[in-house]
Amino acid sequence: MLFPLMSQIITLSKPRIVKSKNEGVMHACGHDGHTSILLTAARILNEVKDDFAGSVILCFERGEESGKGYKYLLAYLDSKNINIDACYAIHVSPDYKSGVMAIGAGGINAGSLAFDITIKGNSGHGSRPYEANNPLDCFVDIYSGLKSLRMNNFSPFDPMTYSIGAVQMGNKYNQIPDKLRFRGSMRFFDREKVGYKFYEDFKSLIINKSKANNCKVIFDTYTKPRFPIINDLNLSALALTSMTDELGEDFVKEASPSMGSDTFATYSYQWPSLYIMLGINNEEKGSGAALHSPKFDLDEKALIHGTAATARFVVDFLNSDIELADRPYKNRLRDFFIEEDRSDEEIEDIYETITR
């Protein structure tokens, strides 16, 4: 059996309230902790390699937050014709007490889509707004429609969230700008029923509101719905048993689904996968602030549990006869890239890049 272990490598630009001893860096989202777990688990597994049958691949993914690194890693694995049985990843979480392994089955992290849109009106002087066409008016209409989209177009029983994180226009107090740019994201679990419906409905809303306000609209970025993370049921059950044996019942909990998104979803559509959370919340040490917040920090002692549980689970998996369900895009990476709306030229460039 072949079992890849995942870690993500990235730095985030944040105000550094919780600083590292290394100038200019901080945990930010815990990816350095993930890397520490992966490297230490690898050392342990190497020391006990005679105790299990199979191979383990360590995968270090660059740029997870930007979503630009996974495609090269997947293409590399595909180009080497590596036959993978299952994948595993771990992510720190302030939602659970320090050292707790939170394990969930089925949909565990949401899929997402991102948008970056420019509205073009007509500029003018602030003293003569009637001679201009303020793109802000159009945006207000769009935002109002967006706020009611959830209630009017979707069942309350279908989990979804969306938000606008950036709005940019003008920099003069007495000048009406000719354009406004806004950016945001949307999250879901049911890609077909919810993700694609929002994709179509929100796009129609933007176009119709722009026409009504005599504005032009440019979809600088409007991604197709990306995939949610789906945990294999049998892998989840095995991890529950394995990690409970290793850490005890007090340190293994059932994970609640999260509306956060992660590029590990792309692996979970290639191979049976397991994505678990490692609690880092410790009030005495001041850890427990939200991911990506400037006060985020982690209790580094939690990494000991993460490492021990990871190594134990890998050994138990490789020595098991567990049955795993095939995933939709197993051995079909090019089809997967096409489903992500990538052109043939872009796909070829991905494969060429990994050979340079």
Regions found by a protein language model. Name each.
Residues 1-2, 55-57, 84-88, 250-251, ...:
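Structural motif
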Residues 2-5, 115-117, 275-281:
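Non-cysteine beta-strand/loop elements that form the S-adenosyl-L-methionine
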Residues 6-26, 32-33, 45-177, 262, ...:
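Histidine/acidic-residue-rich, glycine-tolerant segments that coordinate divalent metal ions
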Residues 35, 67-68, 229, 304:
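Loop/helix-junction capping segments adjacent to catalytic residues or to phosphate/diphosphate-binding pockets
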Residues 35-42:
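DPxDG-like acidic metal-binding loop motif
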Residues 40, 68-72, 130, 197-200, ...:
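Generic recognition of short, well-ordered alpha-helical segments
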Residues 140-356:
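Metal-dependent amide/peptide-bond hydrolase catalytic core
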